[in-house]
Structure formats: structure tokens, C-alpha cells
A protein has these predicted regions:
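Substrate-agnostic recognition of the 12-TM MFS/MFS-like secondary transporter fold
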Residues: 18-30, 55-64, 107-161, 223-231, ...
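Transmembrane alpha-helix termini and helix-breaking/packing motifs in multi-pass membrane transporters
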Residues: 31-41, 67-69, 152-170, 364-386
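Helix-loop junctions at membrane interfaces in 12-TM secondary transporters
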Residues: 95-108, 301-315, 325-329
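Symmetry-related core transmembrane helices of the 12-TM Major Facilitator Superfamily/SLC fold
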Residues: 169-186, 381-399
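Flexible cytoplasmic inter-helical loops of multi-pass small-molecule transporters
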Residues: 185-209
Length: 413
């Protein structure tokens, strides 16, 4: 018994450490990758980065279905394999010619495989390998270190890139990725390999028929699609990223703006959670930070090339839209739907995979529109497009408000 407790404590520390390292390099493969690809292009165009995003999200949707059995039956293998693909991804950044038309495709394949193979096993281990009396401590300690990494690492990476180069900085990220893999070797599940009984597995078509039969499951499709259209790395956020790149002037400034966005997200989330027992105050917070989603693109249209507006727009989209609305409200609501409307968890994994497909569809549609406008030389229409797509956030808020939720009656799977 004592040996089991020690093993679970070690597993807890490994999960926290690996997650911190993952978030430490997230900015490197996001806003800094965008800046790198734009500079490497012949016309200083973000087209190659947008192609990378489209391919990545398309593959994430496909892999979430294709690799479903692997992530269910061989959870530990899938988790460790994700870190191997992360290493391949960074090696590709170091050795591939960034001006090559194949560069965004190769990096996108490794990135999609890493994401799909990492997160589902990670969520499974968070549930099965953490003792009930340690779960609150695990979440609070892990989240605190992750928040620190999100604030500090963009600035650190910005300084390193500004004084060397993106490719040389990739060597630092490669060390972080290798460290992740080595740490994962210290993880030994108490529940061996996380295998799921065959009787609990269902085909995707069975689950689709189940979802189409029940109105409550329709809400998962709507919410996932809307997430992809605006709040989850969608075209709206891409416009803000492209706009801030043109105003930042340096990678260090990009790092500072990204770190500021992370700090703002932490404060807003803290205020929202402090008001958890006061529904009216929570709604006040929710609606008070909603108008800038529309007003900031409008200001950018009225005052083009204004760096202050570009910076504020970027910080708002990253902190409020991406971190708060997407990572907190919508994901929490999706899990709440599954918990309230399924009597057992036999369909949960398949439903989450189908939701990932609809999320990818929403992302691809809006990013493709942004790419088309850029390729046609219609860059001046990017902000009007962002303004138009910003109205999609209102139905998202409608769906995520507890008072707007559907019936409490559960349906039988």
C-alpha cells in the first residue's frame, strides 16, 4: 500500500512537470512561429503560417477519430509517443528550409500528432493516477506553475530570439521536448496502461446516430462548431495575431504582449472564480468583457495602422477570447453537458472525438477565409471580416450560461 502511494505521488509530480514544460514551449510554436514564417516568406506574407494552421487542424480532426483506439487501449504508449512527435517537430524547424513549400505541411503533421496523442491520455491520467485527497492540491500547484510559465516564457523566448534567431532558439525547445520524454519514463501508472474494456467501445457511426437522436447532444455540435469559428485559434484570432506582428517591431515585443495577455487572463479567471457563488456577479463579469470583441475590430477599421489598437486587440483576443471563453467557459460547459446528459461514460470518448472534428471544421472555414483574402490581395478586408465573425461570440455566451442550459433530465446511453 505504501509503495502504491509513493508511486502515485511520483506520477503526480511527473504529470505536473511534463505539463509545465509543454506550456513553456507553446508560445514558440504559435506567435513566434508565425513571425518566423512571415519573415521567411518572399513577400512578408502570413500565408504559409495560415496553411500550417489549416493542415494542422484538419489532421487533428482526422487523427482524433483514426487514433481513437490507440489512445483508449494504449494510453501510456500514446502519451509518450506524443512527446516523440514533439521532438520531430522541433528537429523539422531546425533542419528544414523554412522557405520550402513543404515546411508548413511537415511541421503541421508532427504538431497534430503531438496534440491528439497527448491530451486525451493526459486527462485520463489526471483522473486515474491522482488520489482523491490529492486532486485539489494537484490542480492548484500545477495550475500555478503553468500560469507562471505562460507569463514568463514568452518574454524569455522573445529575448533569446531577438539576440540570436528562431532556429537557434529551437535548440532550447528541443532540450525541453527531450526532457519531457525522459520525465515521462518515470511515470508508471497504477492502473496498468489504462486499457478500456472492449464492451465499452463503440463505432463512430453508432455514436453519431446516438447524438443525432438527442437534442442535448446537438448542443455539443453547435458549441464545438462555434468555438472553431471564433474563440479557439480561429480566423478572428489570426487577424489579431497578424495585425500585432505588423505593429510589434521585434520578437521581444511579441513576447511581452503575449505575456501580458496571459497575465490578464489569470486576473479575469480569478475574478470569475471568486464570484462562483454569486451568479449575478458572474454574469456581470461575463457581459462586461464581451463588447470589446466587436468594438476593437471596429476601432481598427476606423483607425487603421494604429499600433495601440493592434496591441490591445491582440491582448484581448488571447486573454479573453482564447483563454477565458474558450479554455474555461466552453470546455467546462461541454464537460457539464456530458456529465448531466449521459448516465454512463461509455460514449464520452467518442463524443469528444466527434466534437474535435466539428471544432476543426469551424477553425478551417474561418482561417481559409483569412488566407483567401490575403492571397487575393484584399488585406484591407481582414478587419471587416473579424468584425463580422465577432458576432458569433454571442450565441457562444448564450450556450455557456447556466441559466440557458437545457433540461436536467438525463438520457440513457
Amino acid at each position: 500500500m505504501l509503495q502504491k502511494l509513493r508511486k502515485m505521488r511520483t506520477n503526480e509530480n511527473v504529470l505536473i512537470a511534463v505539463d509545465i514544460l509543454l506550456h513553456s514551449k507553446s508560445a514558440f510554436m504559435n506567435v513566434f512561429l508565425m513571425a518566423f514564417m512571415i519573415r521567411a516568406s518572399l513577400k512578408d506574407s502570413p500565408a504559409s503560417f495560415l496553411i500550417y494552421c489549416i493542415v494542422r487542424y484538419a489532421l487533428m480532426g482526422i487523427f482524433s477519430i483514426v487514433l481513437l483506439r490507440l489512445t483508449r487501449r494504449h494510453t501510456l504508449l500514446a502519451w509518450r509517443t506524443s512527446m516523440i512527435f514533439s521532438i520531430f517537430q522541433i528537429i523539422g524547424v531546425i533542419f528544414l528550409n523554412s522557405a520550402s513549400p513543404y515546411f508548413p505541411f511537415v511541421i503541421a503533421v508532427f504538431s497534430a500528432l503531438e496534440s491528439v496523442l497527448y491530451w486525451r491520455p493526459k486527462m485520463y491520467f489526471d483522473t486515474t493516477e491522482i488520489a482523491d485527497d490529492r486532486r485539489l492540491h494537484f490542480k492548484s500547484v500545477g495550475q500555478s506553475w503553468i500560469e507562471l510559465a505562460k507569463v514568463a516564457m514568452p518574454v524569455v523566448l522573445g529575448i533569446i530570439i531577438s539576440n540570436s534567431s528562431y532556429v537557434r532558439t529551437a535548440n532550447v525547445i528541443l532540450i525541453i521536448s527531450i526532457s519531457q520524454l525522459l520525465l515521462s519514463m518515470m511515470f508508471h501508472p497504477v492502473n496498468k496502461d489504462g486499457k478500456v474494456k472492449k464492451a465499452e467501445e463503440h463505432t463512430i457511426m453508432d455514436v453519431m446516430r446516438f447524438m443525432l437522436k438527442h437534442d442535448s447532444m446537438h448542443k455539443i455540435i453547435y458549441l464545438s462548431l462555434l468555438r472553431g469559428i471564433i474563440v479557439s485559434s480561429a480566423g478572428y484570432l489570426m487577424v489579431a495575431q497578424i495585425n500585432v506582428y505588423r505593429s510589434a517591431g521585434s520578437d521581444l515585443n511579441l513576447g511581452i504582449f503575449t505575456a501580458t495577455a496571459s497575465a490578464v487572463a489569470i486576473v479575469v479567471l480569478w475574478l470569475y472564480r471568486r464570484a462562483s457563488h454569486r451568479a449575478r456577479l458572474q454574469k456581470t463579469i461575463l457581459f462586461s468583457i464581451l463588447p470589446p470583441a466587436v468594438l476593437l475590430p471596429l476601432c481598427a477599421i476606423l483607425f487603421p495602422n494604429n499600433p495601440v489598437i493592434a496591441i490591445v486587440f491582440y491582448i484581448y483576443t488571447q486573454s479573453i477570447i482564447e483563454s477565458f471563453y474558450n479554455s474555461t467557459l466552453t470546455i467546462t460547459r461541454l464537460q457539464d453537458i456530458l456529465s448531466r446528459h449521459l448516465r454512463d461514460d461509455s460514449y464520452r470518448v467518442e463524443i469528444e472525438s466527434i466534437a474535435e472534428v466539428f471544432l476543426s471544421v469551424g477553425r478551417i472555414v474561418t482561417i481559409t477565409i483569412v488566407l483567401t483574402l490575403i492571397n487575393l490581395g484584399l488585406d484591407y478586408l481582414l478587419m471587416p471580416f473579424a468584425l463580422l465573425s465577432s458576432f458569433a461570440i454571442f450565441p457562444i455566451v448564450y450556450l455557456t450560461l447556466p441559466s440557458r442550459m437545457w433540461s436536467r433530465d438525463k438520457i440513457r446511453a
